[in-house]
Amino acid sequence: MEDFVRQCFNPMIVELAEKAMKEYGEDPKIETNKFAAICTHLEVCFMYSDFHFIDERGESTIVESSDPNALLKHRFEIIEGRDRTMAWTVVNSICNTTGVEKPKFLPDLYDYKENRFIEIGVTRREVHTYYLEKANKIKSEKTHIHIFSFTGEEMATKADYTLDEESRARIKTRLYTIRQEMASRGLWDSFVNPREAKRQLKKDLKSLEPCAGLPTKVSHRTSPALKTLEPMWMDSNRTAALRASFLKCQKK
């Protein structure tokens, strides 16, 4: 999976994901599914913002090639991918300038046209289920939620999808391509199926010497980027397996 991530995603995205994980003691070489999920989420956030500007009349416009004579402002402020301190600095600046309510959790984007923060979700599960989880966590009608899935489904607050259909289609196509590329390498099942991941984890653990390299403590810290992602079942399975193996070693 790590090799796939480095081949599939832009080096800048990979670097941002690595920094986010390492800052919180997570190793991209071990937490490879999480590594892939963070990179995917970052790319969707960047694609959401790509080519969208506001002209001198305040109207939203799409420009795919830069025109030095055009008086354009980026429609979206990208918050995701920044370190927490800088991200909150950007959020506070936006709130002070626009008067919008400060969110309790770091959002992913700010839309200068609609004057609202946006929370982007990318899920391997049912979009409605994940949308409700996001809404229950945020508990604010001020933050707009937009969920995408790897199957081409999407869901947004009040069915307001913010972007034009073509822009959203680019994101859906990219997610579908990622899924297909994972599947062609035999990675998709372990990325999306908890049982398969658990089976593989047990197999990997059996190949290790008893107690060798097993941690006595498990970190429960969550990286900034993952606060925008769905709960990663891989973490709980790995934690449970390591704990069980460690207890067996203690008894011996």
Swiss-Prot record:
Ligase in keyword set: no
MF term (GO), any: RNA binding
InterPro entries xrefs: PA/PA-X, PA/PA-X_sf
Range of residues in the leader sequence: none
Record keywords, A-Z: Decay of host mRNAs by virus, Eukaryotic host gene expression shutoff by virus, Host cytoplasm, Host gene expression shutoff by virus, Host mRNA suppression by virus, Host nucleus, Host-virus interaction
Pfam families reported for this sequence: Flu_PA (PF00603)
Catalytic residues (UniProt): E80, D108
Site for Important for efficient shutoff activity, residues: K202, K203, K206
Compartment(s) of residence: Host cytoplasm; Host nucleus
Annotated site residue numbers, Important for efficient shutoff activity and nuclear localization: R195, K198, R199
Gene3D superfamilies: Influenza RNA-dependent RNA polymerase subunit PA, endonuclease domain
Record GO biological process: viral RNA genome replication; viral translational frameshifting
Free-text domain note: The probable endonuclease active site in the N-terminus and the basic amino acid cluster in the C-terminus are important for the shutoff activity. The C-terminus acts as a nuclear localization signal. The C-terminus is recruited to host protein complexes involved in nuclear Pol II RNA processing.
Assigned protein family: Belongs to the influenza viruses PA-X family.
Protein purpose: Plays a major role in the shutoff of the host protein expression by cleaving mRNAs probably via an endonuclease activity. This host shutoff allows the virus to escape from the host antiviral response. Hijacks host RNA splicing machinery to selectively target host RNAs containing introns for destruction. This may explain the preferential degradation of RNAs that have undergone co- or post-transcriptional processing.
Record protein name field: Protein PA-X
Native source organism of the sequence: Influenza A virus (strain A/Chicken/Hong Kong/715.5/2001 H5N1 genotype E)
Gene: PA
